[in-house]
C-alpha cells in the first residue's frame, strides 16, 4: 500500500488474515521504540485520560503512518482491556505534512500528561519526550525503515 492509493483491508480475499502489508513491516524499529518506551509505565498511566493519538507524516510515508497508527490503537486497546474500569475513548488521527518534514507522533491526554515523539528517519533517530504520572521522561533511540527484503522477511516470519 506504500505505492497504491487504497488500503489493503479493502481487498476482498478468501483469507484476509494471510495478507501482510510490507508498509507495516517497514516500521519495525519505530514500533520497537514506542513499545520499549511505554513498557516502563503501568498500563493505567498509559491509557487513563488519553484523548488523542495523532501521527503526522509526509505523503510518501502515508501507508507506514496509517498502519503504525493501527498498531498503536491495537496496543492501547489491549492495555485498556487489562485495566479495570477503563474504556479507551481516544481519537486516532493520521495527518499529512509537507514532503521532507520529519514524521511525529503525539499522545494528548485530558490531564497534564503528554507524549511527543519525533521520528528523524534521515538521521535515524527517534526522540521521545513525555510527562506521565506527573514525572518528566525522555528517550532517544535508533530507528530506520526496513529495506524491502528485510520487510518481506519480517512479514513472512513474524506477520
Where are these regions (language model features)?
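C-terminal, charge/polar-rich interaction regions
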Residues: 59-159
Amino acid at each position: 500500500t506504500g505505492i497504491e492509493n487504497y488500503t489493503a483491508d479493502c481487498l476482498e480475499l478468501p483469507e484476509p488474515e494471510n495478507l501482510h502489508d510490507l508498509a507495516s513491516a517497514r516500521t519495525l524499529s519505530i514500533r520497537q521504540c514506542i513499545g520499549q518506551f511505554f513498557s516502563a509505565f503501568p498500563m493505567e498511566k498509559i491509557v487513563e485520560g488519553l484523548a488523542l493519538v495523532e501521527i503526522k507524516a509526509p505523503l510518501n510515508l502515508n501507508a507506514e503512518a496509517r498502519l503504525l497508527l493501527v498498531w498503536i490503537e491495537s496496543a492501547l486497546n489491549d492495555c485498556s482491556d487489562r485495566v479495570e474500569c477503563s474504556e479507551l475513548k481516544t481519537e486516532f488521527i493520521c495527518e499529512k505534512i509537507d514532503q521532507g518534514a520529519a514524521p511525529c507522533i503525539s499522545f494528548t491526554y485530558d490531564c497534564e500528561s503528554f507524549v511527543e515523539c519525533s521520528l528523524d528517519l534521515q538521521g535515524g533517530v527517534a526522540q521521545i519526550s513525555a510527562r506521565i504520572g506527573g514525572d518528566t521522561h525522555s528517550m532517544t533511540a535508533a530507528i530506520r525503515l526496513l529495506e524491502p527484503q528485510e520487510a518481506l522477511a519480517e512479514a513472512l516470519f513474524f506477520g
